[in-house]
């Protein structure tokens, strides 16, 4: 791994490093993630589509990779930036090194970068376009061409690009030491899950709570969903700008009229908000990490959450029937709402973590409670 690599940002900043992945080039929005672990889950999170991820923890790759920690069918991050790749990896579950994993998944990555300097730059100026090029012939001019071609995340409807193309069933539950992934004996609730870029661990979290899931493509109509006669509807995470997802917004509006319990996270939270007339905005400082403090306004408690989003809901545009339930303690941005006249709730972060804590797993329990109440009514 002696191939030189180049990282260039839209503001003209240039970083020289070493290629540790697939040889080639990658462009996208450069962001930073503060998670100490979970690099494989981050790489395979579809919400990172068209984004180059900087990991702030200095040593990445210590535990290798394995098939069980993948959150989707492939790597979706456009590229990876790290400080140091260890020469050796060690873990009882490891089957492949991070380097080999990146090469096999054709993912461009760069190491030997001053990630502290890069993170401070992104923290001061905000997320911006960037490009990684590998090889001795990589030039700043070529990188600038790639950055210009990428443009911005604003206006990009990426959910339909990462979504499944066919409906499928899911029953597999969460991982247990010594057992692997466990499927519960009883799953009394039928949930239709919209795949806007869904992570497998949120499906497992719901399955472990008694849900049999039918996962549908992002552009599935409300009529087709209701024809499946679900007990509830789940709206997944996903990448890109939520406003161009008009198909999702229209479907949510019709589903809310049906009275079915609905729960959304991440992009799903934003689509619910847009469906009730609120507005979203591009964040200058996006949230990416597994240590974000959020306050539950009902209980007053602080929960530590996993976050991954570059757009947020403008709290000032919420209608009267939307009650704010959670707010970020980093920047006071809106983190959760529920409707006062319908069994609809949503959260901006990731209850399933992967990586990160599961402090807000109780939100999934509340969704289960709404379905139980609806079935008993």
From Swiss-Prot:
Enzyme class, broadest EC rank: ligase
Superkingdom per UniProt: Bacteria
Enzyme Commission (EC) number: 6.3.5.5
Location of the region described as CPSase in the Swiss-Prot/TrEMBL record: 1-186
Family the entry assigns: Belongs to the CarA family.
HAMAP family, alphabetized: CPSase_S_chain (MF_01209)
PANTHER family found in the cross-reference section: CARBAMOYL-PHOSPHATE SYNTHASE SMALL CHAIN, MULTIFUNCTIONAL TRYPTOPHAN BIOSYNTHESIS PROTEIN-RELATED
UniProt name for this protein: Carbamoyl phosphate synthase small chain
């Amino acid at each position: 791994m002696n191939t030189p690599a180049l990282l260039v940002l839209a503001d003209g900043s240039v970083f020289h490093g070493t290629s540790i992945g697939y040889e080639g080039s990658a462009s996208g929005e450069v962001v930073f993630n503060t998670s100490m672990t979970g690099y494989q889950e981050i790489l395979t999170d579809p919400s990172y589509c068209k984004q180059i991820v900087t990991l702030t923890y200095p040593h990445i790759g210590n535990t290798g990779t394995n098939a069980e920690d993948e959150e989707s069918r492939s790597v979706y991050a456009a590229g990876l930036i790290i400080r140091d790749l260890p020469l050796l990896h060690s873990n009882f579950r490891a089957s492949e090194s991070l380097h080999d994993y990146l090469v096999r998944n054709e993912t461009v990555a760069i190491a030997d970068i001053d990630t502290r300097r890069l993170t401070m730059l992104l923290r001061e100026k905000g997320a911006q376009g960037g490009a990684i090029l590998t090889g001795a012939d990589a030039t700043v001019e070529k990188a600038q061409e790639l950055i210009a071609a990428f443009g911005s995340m604003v206006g990009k409807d990426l959910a339909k690009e990462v979504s499944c193309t066919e409906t499928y069933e899911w029953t597999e539950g969460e991982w247990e030491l010594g057992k692997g992934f466990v499927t519960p004996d009883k799953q009394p609730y039928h949930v239709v899950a919209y795949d806007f870029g869904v992570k497998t661990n949120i499906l497992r979290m719901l399955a472990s709570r008694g849900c049999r899931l039918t996962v549908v493509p992002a552009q599935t109509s409300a009529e087709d969903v209701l024809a499946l006669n679900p007990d509830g509807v789940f709206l997944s995470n996903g990448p890109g700008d939520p406003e161009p997802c008009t198909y999702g917004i229209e479907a949510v509006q019709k589903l809310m009229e049906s009275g079915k319990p609905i729960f959304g996270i991440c992009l799903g939270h934003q689509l619910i908000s847009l469906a009730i007339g609120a507005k979203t905005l591009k964040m200058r400082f996006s949230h990416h990490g597994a240590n974000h403090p959020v306050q539950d306004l009902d209980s007053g408690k602080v929960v530590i959450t996993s976050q991954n989003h570059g757009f947020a809901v403008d709290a000032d545009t919420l209608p009267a029937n939307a009650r704010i339930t959670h707010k970020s303690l980093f920047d006071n941005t809106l983190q959760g709402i529920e409707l006062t006249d319908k069994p609809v709730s949503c959260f901006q972060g990731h209850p399933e973590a992967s990586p990160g804590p599961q402090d807000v797993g109780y939100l999934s329990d509340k969704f289960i409670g709404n379905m139980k109440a609806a079935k008993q009514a």
